[in-house]
């Protein structure tokens, strides 16, 4: 069974196709493109698991393959340069297509290449992790890390098509599954407390049909937000809850100790604690948020004992959401969220970071 959501964009509208058949939905878009070349960008793990998918398109299209370096290290200008070389050697033109098959790292990397090669070529996202299905593949954010700073170089460049299949989730580790749940908890806590409550009880039975419904709900919320605020003027900032601190934690751990969903979980708990201190959020809500993460064995405290408040502060000062001399945090409230600016030289922020590290 196939279901389609159409996402409106000021750049180009695009469909999100939900299907159990990962081989067919691409054909309509590619048929309209005519005789095109395809460059598949993936990683070794996904390639080994889904070789039939790649072979299927090799039969019908002039297709090429780029296997990126493992983990977050592939979100780099060096990897981008290697892909440019691959495209040039294969004589790709502006009408040809990039297809990303993988998690958020692969989607961000391939999308950035598509956005910048010939000033923009078509690309298709096939997200294979829960996190990339409900979050990173939707909305057109693409980019790479630079000198240890998360997503420092990037753009907003929507895909031409997204293929979402729950079948990919069958091969996810528990840890990767939990990382995707982390982003769903964020969406539920800020935008849909009913979804949040469903996520609280879901680990007890793991009903697959319920999981599909929750994925669809989370995607619908992300779709609604990016349609209303594609370029992150206000509403889309709500999706950055946990990400200011989370990205700083990722950077200081060199994207190795914590995966994205784990760092964001810690960031959400830390930022929710500040919201409680500011009387924006109840202690009961904070405890419910912590309980949700703990239900999926997601971390809520820092294990990196060598991390200091001063080091966190240094990275926070480079965050792309900052405004002038203010570090901007997205804090949850009882009924939603607020943008909370703190002066970069405010000693209270440093004291708060120290207190969080002591609690951890």
Curated annotation (Swiss-Prot):
InterPro entries: Dehydroquinate_synthase, DHQ_synth_AroB, DHQ_synth_fam, DHQS/DOIS_N, DHQS_C. It catalyses: 7-phospho-2-dehydro-3-deoxy-D-arabino-heptonate = 3-dehydroquinate + phosphate. Binds 1 divalent metal cation per subunit. Can use either Co(2+) or Zn(2+). Pathway: Metabolic intermediate biosynthesis; chorismate biosynthesis; chorismate from D-erythrose 4-phosphate and phosphoenolpyruvate: step 2/7. It is found in: Cytoplasm. One of its GO terms (cellular component) is cytoplasm. Keywords: Amino-acid biosynthesis, Aromatic amino acid biosynthesis, Cobalt, Cytoplasm, Lyase, Metal-binding, NAD, Nucleotide-binding, Zinc. It holds the Pfam family DHQS_C. GO terms for molecular function: 3-dehydroquinate synthase activity; metal ion binding; nucleotide binding. It is an enzyme of class 4 (lyase). Belongs to the sugar phosphate cyclases superfamily. Dehydroquinate synthase family. This is 3-dehydroquinate synthase. It comes from Streptococcus equi subsp. zooepidemicus (strain H70).
């Amino acid at each position: 069974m196939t279901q389609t959501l159409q996402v409106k964009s000021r750049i180009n509208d695009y469909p999100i196709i939900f299907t159990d058949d990962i081989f067919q939905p691409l054909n309509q878009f590619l048929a309209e493109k005519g005789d095109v070349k395809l460059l598949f960008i993936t990683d070794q793990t996904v390639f080994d698991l889904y070789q039939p998918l790649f072979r299927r398109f090799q039969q019908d299209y002039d297709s090429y393959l780029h296997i990126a370096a493992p983990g977050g290290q592939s979100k780099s200008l060096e990897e981008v340069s290697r892909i440019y070389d691959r495209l040039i050697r294969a004589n790709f033109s502006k009408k040809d297509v990039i297809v990303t098959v993988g998690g958020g790292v692969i989607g961000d990397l391939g999308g950035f290449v598509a956005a910048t090669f010939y000033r923009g070529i078509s690309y298709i996202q096939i997200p294979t992790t829960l996190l990339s299905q409900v979050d990173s593949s939707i909305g057109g954010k693409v980019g790479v890390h630079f000198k240890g700073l998360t997503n420092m170089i990037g753009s907003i460049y929507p895909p031409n098509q997204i293929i979402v299949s729950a079948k990919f989730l069958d091969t996810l580790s528990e840890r990767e599954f939990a990382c995707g749940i982390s982003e769903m908890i964020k969406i539920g806590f800020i935008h849909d407390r009913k979804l949040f409550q469903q996520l609280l009880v879901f680990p007890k039975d793991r009903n697959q049909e319920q999981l599909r419904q929750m994925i669809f709900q989370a995607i619908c919320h992300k779709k609604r937000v990016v349609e209303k605020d594609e370029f992150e003027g206000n509403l889309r900032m709500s999706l950055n809850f946990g990400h200011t601190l989370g990205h700083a934690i990722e950077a200081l751990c060199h994207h190795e100790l914590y995966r994205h969903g784990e760092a964001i979980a810690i960031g959400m708990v830390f930022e929710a604690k500040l919201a409680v201190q500011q009387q924006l959020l109840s202690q009961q809500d904070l405890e419910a948020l912590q309980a949700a993460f703990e239900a999926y064995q997601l971390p809520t405290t820092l294990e990196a004992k060598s991390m200091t408040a001063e080091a966190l502060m240094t990275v926070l000062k480079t965050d792309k959401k900052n405004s002038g001399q203010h570090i901007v945090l997205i804090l949850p409230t009882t009924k939603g969220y607020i943008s909370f600016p703190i002066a970069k030289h405010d000693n209270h922020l440093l004291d708060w970071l120290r207190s969080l590290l002591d609690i951890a």
